[in-house]
Amino acid sequence: MKDLTHVDEKGVKMVEVGHKDVVFRKAVAKGRIRLKPETIELIKAGKTKKGNVIAAAQIAGILAVKKTPELIPLCHPIPLTGVDITFEFGDDYIEATCEVRAYYKTGVEMEALTGVSVALLTIWDMVKAVEKDENGQYPFTRIEDIRVVEKVKGEE
């Protein structure tokens, strides 16, 4: 079993990466939000009351990637070289993909996971009025399957 790198006998710590080489890093995370089919159609048609759902989710996700070390206390601030957030539509879901790139001493998986999570949360926020049932609940809406699907260390 591997040891935890952020915890030792003295408590919690930020891992020392000063000795590591600067290399290309990439992480891709995906996740889905389940929505009513009618909500998906409203988003595609650009007819939601709060505005362009996809553009807002992209901007929020990119901002979240940049803010990751402020949200997750033991993450290193990383000089990012690029972030892409894309979406694929299904009949009752939107799948978000967040790709993060950097040249640095440590990986960018947490940044990719944070970006995809906030992008999906932003979609929820922008469509919650049409997703609620008559009791103000969200019986169908859910965020699921957030995961890292690719990690690259080394050559681009």
Swiss-Prot record:
Which processes are annotated in GO (biological process)?
Mo-molybdopterin cofactor biosynthetic process
Catalytic activity reads:
(8S)-3',8-cyclo-7,8-dihydroguanosine 5'-triphosphate = cyclic pyranopterin phosphate + diphosphate
Known pathway: Cofactor biosynthesis; molybdopterin biosynthesis
Please report a single Pfam family linked to this protein. Answer: MoaC
Tell me which UniProt keywords the record has, alphabetically: Lyase, Molybdenum cofactor biosynthesis
Which residues are noted in the entry as substrate-binding?
A: 74-76, 110-111
Question: What positions does UniProt annotate as the active site of this protein?
Answer: 125
CDD domains assigned: MoaC_A
Record EC number: 4.6.1.17
UniProt GO MF annotations = cyclic pyranopterin monophosphate synthase activity
What domain of life does the UniProt record list for this protein's source?
Archaea
Family, per entry:
Belongs to the MoaC family.
Subunit-structure text: Homohexamer; trimer of dimers.
- Function description: Catalyzes the conversion of (8S)-3',8-cyclo-7,8-dihydroguanosine 5'-triphosphate to cyclic pyranopterin monophosphate (cPMP).
Its protein name is Probable cyclic pyranopterin monophosphate synthase
Lineage here is: Archaea, Methanobacteriati, Methanobacteriota, Thermococci, Thermococcales
- Report the gene name: moaC
